[in-house]
Each structure stands twice: as structure tokens, then as C-alpha cells.
Amino acid sequence: PIPLVPDEGFDYNQSYEDLELPRNTYDECVDYIAKEMVLAAQGLPLKRDQLSITRPTRGAALATRALAMLYAASPLMNGNDDAYAQQMTNRDGKRLLNPVYDNSKWAKAAAACKDVMGLGVYHIYTADFRSTHSIAFPATIAPPIHPEYSYKNFPEGWQNIDPFESYRSLFNGQVTAMDNPELIFTRGKNISGERI
């Protein structure tokens, strides 16, 4: 929990005591993040091009909102009344973590996640099934036969994909950030190769 600064700001000529704000509750912080991310999403592009790979998109804003809401719904922050949670108070004794469990937080988090998935931009990266092989790209090692999945194409099964290569390609640099459909937001690299 942090203090939420009002939108109108402060007169910085005031004393520290006058500028001091108490911390807001965890739930108030999550509500603020959710509201701001929805507002940001309205002004962000749906997709990014190669020159703006490190810039946030609508999906990045909505995913940030969804993640904050998932944390708020989790047992750590939702109805936690252990010794640590009881110590999380302001100077006036106000509890910063709500000790009352609220099941509706899970519904709100699920709806926020569905907003991201509903954009239709992000999906699991898959490499095609390969019957030929080379040193760099071995033939697909087929998983053991399973009557429900072996004879169906992805996403219902694995007949047309290479599960190992689908995973490996994301980590060996073969799939660039621009070509990775799983990537919601990235730091990327600048022209000199240094991390941004």
C-alpha cells in the first residue's frame, strides 16, 4: 500500500508535514491501478509495429489491470488476517489489508483477464510438426499416443505441432519479440544491443 496523490497535485512550497499523506489501503490502490489502466488502454494502440516493440499497447495496460486484480483476489491480500497482515497499518491504526474475504474479487479478476484474452491479439506460439531433420532443427519427437490428443490439430491436440520446438524457440532467440504472439510487453533491445 502506498499514498495515492490526488490528481490536482500539491503546492510544493508547503512543509513536509502538510504534504504528508497516509497510505491508502491495498484495495484502494488496486482500484486506482485498475481505473488508470482502463483509461490508458483507451489511448493505446491495439498492436505494435517493429519500431515500437518496447512501447505499451492496449493489451499491456489491460494485462497490468488484470494482474493487479488477481493479486487482490489471492489469499495473500483477500481476507488475510495473519500476524503480518495485522501489522500492516497506518499510524492512526487503520488496517491496510482487508481481513474480510471477498469472493467477488475473483470474479472481477476473471473478467479483467477475459478483457485481455478478448482482444484476440495474443495466443500460444507453436512450431510446425517437422518430419525432416537437420543438425539445427531435428525432426519432431512425437509425444506418446493419446487417443484424445494425438490425432487432433492444435489447440485441441498436438498432431500438427512440435511441442519441444514450440517451447525451445521462445528461449533460444529464434523467435523475435516482434514475432512472439505470446508477448504482451517487453523491454526489448535498443540499436546498440543494450537492454532498454
Where are these regions (language model features)?
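Structured, solvent-exposed acidic/aromatic patches
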Residues: 1-195
